[in-house]
From Swiss-Prot:
Biological classification of the source: Bacteria, Pseudomonadati, Pseudomonadota, Gammaproteobacteria, Moraxellales
Keywords (A to Z) from UniProt: Aminoacyl-tRNA synthetase, ATP-binding, Cytoplasm, Ligase, Nucleotide-binding, Protein biosynthesis
EC number(s) reported in the record: 6.1.1.15
A Pfam family hit: tRNA-synt_2b
Record's subunit section: Homodimer.
Official protein name in the record: Proline--tRNA ligase
Domain of life: Bacteria
Species whose genome carries this gene: Psychrobacter cryohalolentis (strain ATCC BAA-1226 / DSM 17306 / VKM B-2378 / K5)
UniProt-recorded Gene Ontology molecular function terms: aminoacyl-tRNA deacylase activity; ATP binding; proline-tRNA ligase activity
Amino acid sequence: MKASQFLFATLKETPSDADIASSQLMVRAGLIRKIASGLYIWLPMGLRVLQKVERIVREEMQNIGAQEVLMPMTQPAELWQLTGRFNDYGPELLRFKDRHDRDFVLGPTHEEVITNLAQGELRSYKQLPITFFQIQNKFRDEIRPRFGVMRAREFTMKDAYSFHVDQASLAKTYDEMYDAYTRIFTRLGLDFRAVQADTGSIGGFASHEFHVLADSGEDDIAFSDSSEYAANVELAESVSMAERQPATMARENIDTVNMPTCEAVAEHLNVPLATTVKTLIVQGHTPEGEPQLIAVVLRGDHTLNTIKAEKIEEANVPLMMATEEELKAAGLHKGYIGVELNMPVFVDRAAAALSDFVSGANEINKHTTGMNWERDAHITRIVDIRNVHEGDPSPDGKGTLQIKRGIEVGHIFQLGDKYSQAMNCTVSGEDGKPVTLMMGCYGIGVSRIIAAAIEQNNDENGIMWPSTPDISDSLAPFEVAIVPMKSKEDTVMETATALYEELKALGINVLLDDRNERPGVKFADLELIGIPHRIVVSDRNLAEDKYEYVNRRDSEKQLLSRDEVIAKVSGK
């Protein structure tokens, strides 16, 4: 492509409403333009990047036998009503009526539509397993769209859905999809982690997220420094680092006036925060379903993980703290609640390992020192209900946990029969009887990948696209830019054009920057856009049969022969 015939929409100034590096750089580099909150136009430069991601995703889906379809973005509401998600999904689901007063939604995802398709097209177990995928725009009416295309209202997504007669078949396809995702993100040159995750509103019983590591990420992920263990912090398992020691202290009530926090009490007593416990009272129910309060106990230096706590059978979902009225009725005072209670007491593993600890005294302005389990208080059940910390032992026994921020770019689920059961999606089994299909769903945020890659790869001059094992997989809109310097002779442009044609013939995406601009302007634009390889053709260097080569990542200038230049940019 010749730059003089291409839309160069670079900007010198940073947009005032762009809040993170990727958003700023995508606008400045001329990849996107905002037309409304959360809505963006992909300009020619950006569309080249988007199409590269789509190509790699499409190739890997086809490599595992997934078949491409294209479903409508507009979906009839009755399908969502069948699964109950029309009311449950929340305000992110854009609902509207057509001129005939029929209800429709703009699809944020396509489980209902694909299940409806399977219901109509799949008849026999002999057609299974089968996987469909599409690459298509989705719409979620985010209350506060932010971070550019990272959290836009309309975005490009690859969603795939698999259908099976049994769990074993689903698990096999799930593993194949996991491996395909790993290949996709590896080909894209991203530093990523696959982590165990919560199934959320999609539902199901097994799930992994794929996160690109970046400081601007919205999720905390925990992973071992010595093994493959990784999980979203919401699900990362905590293990106790010590066994409970025998009691050595007698219990004693002490005055802690106006000290309702563990931090204040620990400072007052001059003891480590980790030797205190805090008791939270939450709403729950008996095995018979009758309302009751339950207590959850954590070490003073730990925080409650609500997703884990919701897995306590006796806890209500969503997890709700007891109201002031409920605490008053139970004779309890917030900030001074102890562990001797007339209700079920669920104790986190780390808190259960304590001896001679400090707790509330169930009396306002008082705490108790020298508390010990069994001797002084009963544990209903030991549970894992805390958020893990950096440096905690890895649950697999290998190494310690690191915690970093991550940007979710992919999510895979084993859904089971949640949707097929609701929509009566069955096939004839081997015995001729109806079999309700098992499902998997697998999403990749295609447009989000681009922002995540930039968050992970940028400097003060602009974008630095990830280095990829194969140059053809580079996310850069052009892998190579050739810059002919102005000259009175035609030789410079002729040589630059000849090199341009030669590299194109090798299948390399090349930009010939023949714009009527100063060299400094051209170089700044190419660095901003992130072109990995820059080749400068000039009279002076041609006199020595050399070309100036600069790699975007190190900015080191090298004088190379034609063959050396071709070897550099082609990786051969």
